[in-house]
């Protein structure tokens, strides 16, 4: 009862606290098991003493051995009774944890994992300590065995604070090595919009020119900057779980069973810098000027609802990462050659990988369009005044390249304006319906401040809808990699044909117009493809999706008409140029006629004879020059006919063309997004970019990286990970239990 009372007090403390459960569960009290592990030790030792040892002391066990009952059967019965007691305690402990369902903070999101972790950890730890108690009781009394066991566990549990007297903290180690830390504040898009998540990143302040980036060296900044860095490190240690732990103790070894490697995935750092359990590894240097990094999409939980062993992004090459979860290496200048080569290989191994990536985006996007979440995000952005937001506001450039035609910008702004108008209409309709339902008058004179608030809300919704439109384009650029639409490739072939045949006018201007039209056609083909797929269309679109399809179709028709107009114009110009060239040739030939008519007739006769002779004998004559001239004329005519004849692209040509087109459409829409995602074993992460993208797994905080341009991922690979810890503990449990039963079975009871 004492143990359950202590567990109840601990859980009530969590329930009543307004702090995020992530920070509470990962603090020193829980992580090092300074409370739970000793309590479970006392519980297991007491139960074991009553079941296995007490009968030996009062003579009841000697009486049982005198009966025709084997020791193996007695041992099995005692073991079943022990497991029954431990299971009852584990169930009661889990019931205490269920008090968290009555809280209003974020504990509800992790309560399932927490309850199962308490249940499994109590049983396994109880078995381990029971086995140790049985072995100790063969030499000592019950009280002595419990005291020895408790002291043993306590010493190892308190090894972490003792180690801090000897070893430097990770913050001090990094500070001495010249690292400085930078704090990034942001509102986390999570279940509770009031939770503020603080992210700390290690930043390279200075870098000597000419030093190889692969050396991963940081240079000490001035004393004032170093002092600020140390202060930030200390603040990080006080207010977060930023690499401030030592895991070389049995308390953590057993305490990890209470988490199953699942709780607080984004803050649960199983590896810390400069500790005995960590292989120190400074990650790649991210050059933010080039915006080169990884965009990643996590897959769903592999082992079900409770065991959240997520598929972490390993430190692998592009091929392996892409085949595991779908990863792109991006650069403002486009996809690098190695990336595409690796991507092609990955597509061959797993042709559905891009569809899975798109489904992941679409799932997040449908959740993002939820009415309540939209309002919440709008409120969050209003509170932060969009400071540091990488998303463009209304009127900003579409991040199109300098060689794009202004017609593309006009079409894009037209689409965004219609989308924003749709959002305004939906908001107005919704407000009108709400006013009617509540009986509130819509008269402007009676509304007063409400109208001002409504106008402000409309402004927020406009900004939000503009952001949604950008996200739609981002989705399209991803899905474009897997579009298999013959009409699309027919248009691509047509555009390439027209571009190649352009011989007059400003070539550069025509190429820019073709590139702009090409990009618009690609984008709206993909938009049309998405809205036509019922299984991919989110159900939460509602009337918004119909309006979206209408806008798409209108612009699609506009582009189709523009394409036809260009086609007719090009054909007309081509025919005029061809006819003009033919007339000039006829005029020149008429001027040369006269006295040479006889010679020309004889020359043609000789040419005809020579051609016939060449076809029959396949040999050359004295008139080879004239014959070759005739053949060249015929070849020129044939080439012109082939250019006038449309031919669809082959499979190889399509594959080559998709690489070229993807560069423009992908990076013209995605270059504003930068994700620094989780890799290895719970690296120290920070992220900026697309909100609500797997909000439980990424720290989706909009970040302004304008100050520091060179950032390190400070990573640590644990020598013994959480999963390995559980496996080792299970093996240790079986071994200790077998040894304890051996002692119990063959001891002398006389």
UniProtKB/Swiss-Prot annotation:
Positions of transmembrane segments: 2-22, 33-53, 79-99, 116-136, 143-163, 724-744
Compositional bias segments (type: Polar residues): 412-424, 437-451, 618-629
Top-level taxon of the source organism: Bacteria
Membrane topology: Multi-pass membrane protein
Name of the featured protein: Uncharacterized protein MPN_333
Entry-linked InterPro entries: ABC2_NosY/YtrC-like (IPR032688)
Sequence segments annotated as region (Disordered): 385-461, 571-651
Biased composition (Basic and acidic residues): 398-411, 452-461
Lineage summary: Bacteria, Bacillati, Mycoplasmatota, Mycoplasmoidales, Mycoplasmoidaceae
Biased composition (Low complexity): 425-436
UniProt KW keywords: Cell membrane, Membrane, Transmembrane, Transmembrane helix
A GO term, aspect molecular function: ABC-type transporter activity
Entry's Gene Ontology cellular component terms: plasma membrane
Localization in the cell: Cell membrane
Family to which the UniProt record says this protein belongs: To M.pneumoniae MPN_335.
